[in-house]
């Protein structure tokens, strides 16, 4: 029998998560203020998202992330569908203000991440994974054994804190079979199967991560509860016969069209009454907070094709795919869980 994975940490690592999740926040301010003079122009002309994109020559996904981050920081406010520069932004981030901090942030504008943000805003193409020089984009790098092993381990370690919190809020009592879609190491499948009587789980991953998952599940003594199948979530139909689908820290890697595709595939594979569980960092209904989630979304925007989604956005996407009985609950370390039933 392996370790009890259902026990949470004895001390609080919340701030440690926030340092890592918000690592790129200052670089996004530097890129906007110095490369685009964003706040000076917005102060003279409030704009909606489409107008921001046209005026600054930027794309909707990164612009949406940027505006949510600025709103959470009290630098923009949304009124009547348009974004306005706040008094704070006017005083400290416009070029003609005597208290302008643009020269202060200009000392950061040559940082690699700040330069990446300028490119990402203009092209909507994520940068390479920041810890690896001369690497392929993240989605391609995950097909290589070395990168996949390191990345999977990085994501796996969070599960010892986030998994028990997910278990408390997921509402899986009485469920029998869970499919952990793009489940990485299988840590969340292991926690949920250990902590839910009668539940068995299957991790769906593409090579080489499927092999990594088998090894890690075996090391945790969970091979009797959790199995692994290989597959591509975008090319292959999802396996049938499960009454729970789990997307844990998956949807934030993808833009809306691919999120729609994944939710539709889930709906196609689930029988009525089955449950979808989306464990992630979610923005609020207005997409102007929580602050730390908007900062994390900036990091995700820079290295993946996705971002953090708002609770309202997820409700609409799930309803469109054929799910109802929407429920939202906070879990741990700025993460949360959304559940919905297949109609």
Language-model segment annotations:
Residues 1-77, 172, 177-343:
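Alpha-helical subdomain
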Residues 2-6, 14-41, 54-55, 61-176:
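Conserved Class I S-adenosyl-L-methionine-dependent methyltransferase catalytic core
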């Amino acid at each position: 029998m392996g370790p009890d994975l259902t026990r949470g940490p004895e001390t609080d690592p919340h701030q440690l998560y926030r340092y890592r999740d918000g690592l790129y926040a200052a670089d996004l301010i530097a890129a906007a203020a110095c490369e685009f003079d964003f706040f000076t122009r917005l102060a003279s002309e409030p704009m909606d998202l489409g107008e921001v994109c046209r005026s600054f020559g930027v794309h909707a996904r990164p612009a949406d992330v940027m505006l949510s981050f600025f709103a959470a920081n009290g630098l923009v406010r949304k009124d009547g569908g348009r974004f306005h520069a706040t008094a704070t932004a006017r005083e400290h981030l416009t070029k003609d203000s005597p208290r302008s901090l643009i020269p202060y942030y200009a000392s950061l504008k040559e940082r690699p991440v700040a330069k990446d943000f300028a490119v990402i805003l203009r092209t909507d193409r994520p940068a390479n994974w920041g810890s690896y020089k001369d690497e392929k984009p993240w989605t391609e790098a995950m097909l290589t054994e070395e990168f996949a092993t390191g990345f999977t381990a990085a994501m796996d370690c969070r599960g010892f804190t986030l998994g028990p919190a997910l278990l408390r809020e997921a509402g899986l009592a009485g469920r029998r079979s869970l499919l952990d879609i793009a489940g990485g190491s299988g840590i969340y499948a292991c926690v949920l199967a250990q902590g839910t009587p009668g539940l068995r789980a299957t991790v769906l991953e593409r090579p080489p991560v499927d092999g990594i998952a088998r090894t890690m599940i075996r090391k945790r003594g969970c091979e009797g509860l959790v199995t692994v199948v290989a597959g591509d979530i975008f090319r292959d139909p999802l396996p049938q016969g499960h009454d729970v689908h789990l997307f844990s820290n998956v949807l934030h890697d993808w833009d809306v069209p691919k999120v729609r595709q994944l939710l539709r595939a889930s709906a196609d594979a689930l029988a009525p009454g089955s449950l979808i569980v989306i464990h992630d960092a979610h923005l609020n209904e207005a997409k102007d907070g929580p602050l730390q989630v908007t900062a994390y979304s900036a990091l995700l925007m820079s290295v993946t094709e996705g971002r953090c989604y708002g609770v309202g956005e997820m409700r609409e996407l799930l309803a469109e795919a054929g799910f109802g009985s929407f429920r939202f609950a906070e879990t741990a370390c700025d993460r949360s869980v959304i559940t919905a039933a297949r109609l």
